[in-house]
Amino acid sequence: MAESLPILNQPRRHERFDAARELETRLRTTLRGPNHDKVRFDATSRALYTTDSSNYRQIPIGVVVPDDADDVIAAVAACRSLGAPILARGGGTSLAGQTCNAAVVFDFSKHMRRLHSLDPDARVATVEPGIVLDRVREAAELHNLTFAPDPATHSRCTLGGMIGNNSCGTHALMGGKTVDNIRSLEVLLYDGTRLSVGATSDDEFRAILHRGGRVAQLYQGMRQLIDRHADEIRRRFPRIPRRVSGYNLDELLPENGFHVARALVGSEGTLATVLSATLDLVHSPPCRRLVVLGFPDAFVAADAVPAILEHHPIGLEGIDSTLLENMHRKHLAEAERKMLPAGNAFLLVEFGASTDAEVDAIAYAFRAAARSIPHALEANIFAGEDAARIWRVRESALGATVFVPGKPHLWEGWEDAAVPPARLGEYLRSLFALMREYGYHSPLYGHYGQGCVHMRMNFDFESEAGLRAYRSFIDRAADLVVSLGGSISGEHGDGQSRAALLPKMFGAELMQAFREFKRLWDPDNRMNPGKLISAEDEIYQPTENLRVGPGYHAAQPETHFSFDRDHGSFGEATLRCVGVGACRKTDSGSMCPSYMATREEQHSTRGRAHLLWEMLQGNLLDRDWSNEGVKHALDLCLSCKACKSECPVSVDMASWKAEFLAHYHQQHPHELRHYLFGFMDRWAHLAAAVPGLSQRLANLPLQIPPISATIKSILGIAPQRNLPRFAPRTFQQQWRAQNATQAANLPQALLWPDTWNNYYHPQSLTAASQILHTAGYAVQVPRQHVCCGRPLYDFGFLDTARNYLRRILTEFAPQIDSGLPFLFLEPSCASVLRNELLDFFPRDDRARRLADQTLLLSQFLTRHAPHYEPAQHPDTRIVLHGHCHHKAVFNMEDELAWLRRTGATVELLDAGCCGMAGPFGFEREHYSVSQTLGERVLLPAVRAAAPADILVTDGFSCREQIAQNTPRRAMHFAEVLCPPQPTSTP
């Protein structure tokens, strides 16, 4: 290795491209049509694509977001005219650095995601490269078919990316890698040649040569290359289930049908651009069982793999106790982990069949046979939702290896080597001995059934000594893998992490063959240059282009929040995002609503995190809190906090947005509506000054259309929206008027009169007070005006927000110190005291106690009044929508359980965010996105509900979205549980 290692982001000579402005002009001239945002060369757009899920960072020349194949062809021609390198990109979740480069990035994921056809009889589907895997699988499952490879990123990885990477996943054991499931490809070469490739018979080969031209030259060159190197390919290519390293030259061997499409799979965009793909589908067993075996350690679990494979499972995965310990520290899959059998390492063995009886027989026979497997401790069988929950433990693995509290950062860099399954135990023992030499450690998880185990290690990339140790380690680890007949990459590809190690695995002759193959397809070396294979052998080394390298220092700006879990550094917090892209899923969960609506990288949690990191580093983007590009990206963040729970590394973009806006508005004045919405508690309190009268006066302008329209216009409120009207009397006013006496010997709870339920929906608080009384509690209701300050965060009023919380800590000190439960009905208000309170006061004992004592009604009943008898709703269907903060900061299980105790059938919608999100949905510029999100699941479900169905949601914003878009009224959980009561409350 060189004496002086390349330093972070040091550009190479061939990266220099001086015609970016001219290229942008040519692309804009060429790519016309209804979408006007196909060409993006601004700094913000480029910053979004500087990295993927790897350790690497390179600044692209620009970004193209094509509508269709014609756009791709035209854009490549424009790039070719100026010699600009290009890089095709799908979901951007690659782990080896193959989807970041100093090139023009083509993002296929926004528009080119069509499923052109699916023929269940022929078991084939034709798709565009940007389609997400889960969409293909969902369509195929209607016919009991599937696309076999299913990486853990299946909810957001694209088929184009899978083809480029040769992706695998759990069920590659059942149906093979991506390369084994490609029928044909339509591809575009850098020189403009467009062709369809697949298996090639002798007659087809002769016909191609007869036609002549570039395609004939290409095929003739490939045939000659194979004729020269066939014997060496047969000798050196490992015969294992998981060889992903190198080019798939073995697919061009005569015995494999000279399959050109499959030879291109795994080429990481270095040879051609995929325009469409025809996929082979396989039978998907409709009935499945999961058998989980416990072992004393991961090594003996690996030893058991050959014996288990004799039973022909369709999936065989492994996890170890270190991974589970990390999950415990991060509070991941807590209930699911308790379902595992005894042991310190576990194998997840899945079987499939056509009927339940058949698969049960297979699973129970295997469990009986497993008693004879050495060191197997216990075996549990799971089906249905229980099996799905166990699989979620496995799919949480990557998130459990990064940013683990109390542990050093773990990085990719040696995370997916594969060996013959029979030698997996030997490999792991030898590898861990090598790791101990270097002081490295890692959890283990992955595809044990195919000899591929994933890990992330505590590499030191921030010093040259650390880099030298890293390079020495991977050199020796590669030697170990090769000695066992394995592959340096068994799933994630070579990219930049492993490209320099390929000569160890393939030898000089095959490396020359790879370079010849590269020159045949890309003689000008313009396709993802420097990654995997270079025609001139100028590949990037694993120690170049590191996002965090020697001399790196996390930015340390002064902030309002403490960022305590990130050592007090906002800069380190923004490094949390490791690019796995869970925020880019579109069909389930709540994260990330703005991405679901726009499919724009800048509107994903990942995109925003990367922009904030770039801004704080001050390299590509100015280190300036006034950065309009960053503000624009944050503008569509609904502050739903879904990322806090659904992001594998717990990015809290709502808090990051509030922090940014606090600094931004130190230099830019607030808008008038910021004061209206942000300080809504004060306006509501003022409107209630004279009970009954002042509320009517405050509502009056909203009832006169010309005045209401003028107010909306001035404040930038969407004309389609109706501003909520104040209730005639607040809950506090009603409570004080009753002047009720409560027994002194009863346990007490403090019922928080939040702004929304107090001033707008007092009936919810009334119902809650009645529930508490019936449950045997004396109710404390603050007499003074109180507010958690939730709306202040939406506009960056963080100094004021801190003061609100400090006031609560002071004024309610006796109740906090006595351990009194603080009961909230509005999830977004409760989340302030669970979340932001500790972000401001992380070491304040009283703040910690208040956070622990803050409960939603359902939680309170579960903890303190489990014998409460709710109102009964037999033969009724309840449609439940969870507020985003309820799901992110608390959970829905308690509420579900209590609603079921009413005798009703309860359906919890997987609707994500309702789209209203406090003031967001009222703002004119956000109305369209708000409606798109509402219409995704929630509003259609409300309209489809029967008149007798009860609609339940605890969020004021959610109820407003329903009320303003349907004729239905949603109820608060408290209203549903509260039995009919007399009008007065004791």
Question: Which sequence ranges carry the predicted segments?
Answer:
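N-terminal flexible segment immediately upstream of the FAD-binding catalytic core
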Residues: M1-S81, G91-R123, A152, T270, ...
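A glycine-rich phosphate-binding loop feature that marks nucleotide/adenosyl-phosphate handling sites
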Residues: S94-G97, T153-G160, P241-N248, L252, ...
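Terminal amphipathic helices with adjacent charged low-complexity linkers/tails
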Residues: A277-L279, H311-P408, G446, A597-L612, ...
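Iron-sulfur cluster-binding electron-transfer modules in prokaryotic oxidoreductases
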Residues: D522, P529, A654-P986
